[in-house]
Amino acid sequence: MTMLQQILLISVIIGTVHVHEVDCANEVLKARAYIFEAVKGGNPAKTVGIIDLVQTGTLVKMNGSVSGLQPGLHGFHIHEKGDLGNGCLAAGAHFNPHKMMHGAPEDSNRHVGDLGNIETPKTGDTPILISDSVISLTGQHNVIGRAIVIHADMDDLGRGTSELSKTTGNAGARVACGVIGIL
């Protein structure tokens, strides 16, 4: 292959990659997580909700509902692994590829998986309506194959006095979880 042919080949490859990047910026990506009740020491079996994720540009919108939670605020996070075993403990820690401190969704210093709290009303299902520009359905912050975990208690957003505040938001036990899968 001559030098000119090599340069032409490299130019075609670079041009193709560049066009693909532009197309992806306008693409709508979709994912879904079926949420299961946590089973201490075992694997979940009872479905308690569905959460859909839709990404347009850099914004991911999460929309769904979960049943069976106690009224009040519950920590809502994306964890590093898509393993729902042992009462959702097998999902590992919060998704935190940059080794940041725990924080609120609007904080610049936060885990990628820190999505704050969801609120369960006194009666009825828990609505999930979250928008976030840090998580993604592609690339470095891709959450596909990772677990959504709902905690028993309120996430203090890293502002509490407990030692757990800076790592987990002191959000308590894992009560429900589900793996995010591409649609």
Swiss-Prot record:
Q: Which reaction does it catalyse?
A: 2 superoxide + 2 H(+) = H2O2 + O2
Where does this polypeptide localize? Secreted, Extracellular space
Q: PROSITE patterns under this entry? A: SOD_CU_ZN_1 (PS00087), SOD_CU_ZN_2 (PS00332)
Where it mainly occurs, coarsely classed, is: secreted
Which residue ranges run through the membrane? none
> Which Cys-Cys disulfides exist here?
C88-C177
Q: Where is the signal peptide?
A: 1-32
Tell me, what's a Pfam family for it?
Sod_Cu
Glycosylation site list: N63
This entry's Gene Ontology molecular function terms read:
copper ion binding; superoxide dismutase activity
Quote the EC number: 1.15.1.1
Positions annotated to bind Zn(2+): H94, H102, H111, D114
The record's comment on cofactor binding reads: Binds 1 copper ion per subunit.
Give GO cellular component annotations, separated by semicolons: extracellular region
Keyword tRNA-binding part of the UniProt annotation: no
Enumerate the residues binding Cu cation: H77, H79, H94, H151
- SUPFAM superfamilies noted in UniProt: Cu,Zn superoxide dismutase-like
Q: List the InterPro entries hit by this protein, alphabetically.
A: SOD-like_Cu/Zn_dom_sf, SOD_Cu/Zn_/chaperone, SOD_Cu/Zn_BS, SOD_Cu_Zn_dom
User: What keywords does the record list, in alphabetical order?
Assistant: Antioxidant, Copper, Disulfide bond, Glycoprotein, Metal-binding, Oxidoreductase, Secreted, Signal, Zinc
Q: Which residues form a coiled coil?
A: none
Origin: domain of life? Eukaryota
Report the cofactors. Cu cation; Zn(2+)
Q: What does this protein do?
A: Destroys radicals which are normally produced within the cells and which are toxic to biological systems.
Q: Name the family.
A: Belongs to the Cu-Zn superoxide dismutase family.
Q: What is this protein called?
A: Extracellular superoxide dismutase [Cu-Zn]
List the gene name. SOD
